[in-house]
Amino acid sequence: MKAGVFKTKEEVTSDIVKEQLVSVKELTTLKYRYTNVVSFENDNEFYGMKIPFTTKKFIISYDGEVSAGIDLDKAKVDINDEKKAINISLPQAKILSHQIDEDSLTIFDEKESIFNQLKIKDFSEFRKNEMKKTEQELLEKGFLEEASKKSKDAIIEILNINPLIKDEYTVKVN
């Protein structure tokens, strides 16, 4: 029997392409590392006036990292064999994670009053607010738009690993 007599035709289907993408799940395409030095101050008030000797405050430094990308479970794949085209619709990029490195926390100044003591709740709420503020600043600077652009480029690279796709199909990502 000659080799190649029963040669099978390889073909690209939307299921194969979708499986190749979904196996990745989440695609992180952009990371932002930062260091912040921020202060917290709180006084007890009585009818809008600060009460003396009730100030609590701290100054803290920390490192953080924000990751953005896309959820590939929500990608839609359409293959046109006649035109040899693969069209992929991606969801909008989103912030996938935001973490503060607990080992990087440094407290420079800490002051509390016997009448207004620092509590873990103060730090916890402060941390949440600072994280939201950082995320908002990134959104205003186009962080997610950049993550979307990099996601599109990464998807094309991932699919072009398959020689059949690279040689025979045009990949378009929306």
Predicted regions and their residues:
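Domain-level marker for long, solvent-exposed, non-transmembrane regions
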Residues: 1-174
